[in-house]
From Swiss-Prot:
GO terms for biological process: regulation of defense response to virus. Belongs to the non-disulfide-bridged peptide (NDBP) superfamily. Short antimicrobial peptide (group 4) family. Residues 1-23 form the signal peptide. Antimicrobial peptide. This is Peptide Ctry2606. Its main location: secreted. GO terms for cellular component: extracellular region. Expressed by the venom gland. Residues 37-67 form a propeptide. It is found in: Secreted. The modification Leucine amide is found at L33.
């Protein structure tokens, strides 16, 4: 019984260490990629152009109808 308890405790600690390490690595990678991805969020500003007239929108709609 003592051996089973010792093995269970050992593997539980090993699992906790592996989970914390994986979380730290994934957090670091996500942080690096996330920061890089967040820098280029201003591309959405170009999606809406207020200078387009209603005729321009109709022309775009007819061009993209069959796409």
């Amino acid at each position: 019984m003592k051996t089973q308890t010792a093995l269970f405790s050992f593997f539980l600690v090993l699992l906790l260490v592996a989970t914390q390490t994986e979380g730290g690595i994934l957090d670091a990678i996500t942080g690096l990629l996330g920061k890089r991805a967040l820098r280029n969020q201003n591309f959405v500003d170009y999606a809406f152009d207020p200078s387009l007239s209603a005729a321009d929108w109709r022309a775009l709609e007819t061009l993209l109808e069959e796409y």
